[in-house]
Amino acid sequence: MTRKEKKELIWRKLDNSAKIFPLSSSRKYSSVFRLSAVMKENISPKLLEKAVNNALNKFEFFKVRLKKGFFWYYFEYNDKKVVIEEEKDYPCKYIDPNTNNDYLFKVTYFERKINIDIFHSLTDGNSAIQFFKEIVYQYIEIEYAKEFKDKLRTDRKFNFNAEDSYLKNYNKKVKNNTKSKKAYILKGRKIPFDAIR
């Protein structure tokens, strides 16, 4: 990463749809979603860590931590080591920044399965899928380099630009003029909920 790129990554604001998640998230309501992939063989933690670091080099916008400013939350560049650990908690659990080196995603493994839990302020599902696919691809490339030497793709293209999709897709001129039909109302006599017929 060049010095200029690193400077641009020092901080950036949350996009419009991501602003609600830091305010509404808690240990009870995590705002975390999960992606998983099941491999043919048990996962090697060291290789998985290397794969995640390789993927992070391509997806720099995932190398951030969430900070609270005076008026709003923002992302700040995070160069700490990514924590990779064996899965021991339930899926989509609140990501505690203190145990995860402040990253907004958590990579775990269990036997043959690779998981990534992602805090929704960091990204939407599409970017998360692209990032996760890159992790899995990097893992396969490292683990099976000799077997797949001539079969691995080197022409993969990425769009590395962060965008606020809400601003890109929102059109305030479009009004919701659709009229919905009334719901069908059942007729007849109500029976008690616990009645057996």
Residue ranges of predicted features:
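Soluble acyl-CoA-dependent acyltransferase catalytic core bearing the H(X)4D motif
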Residues: L35-R197
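N-terminal beta-alpha "docking/capping" segments at the starts of catalytic domains
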Residues: M1-N42, K187-R197
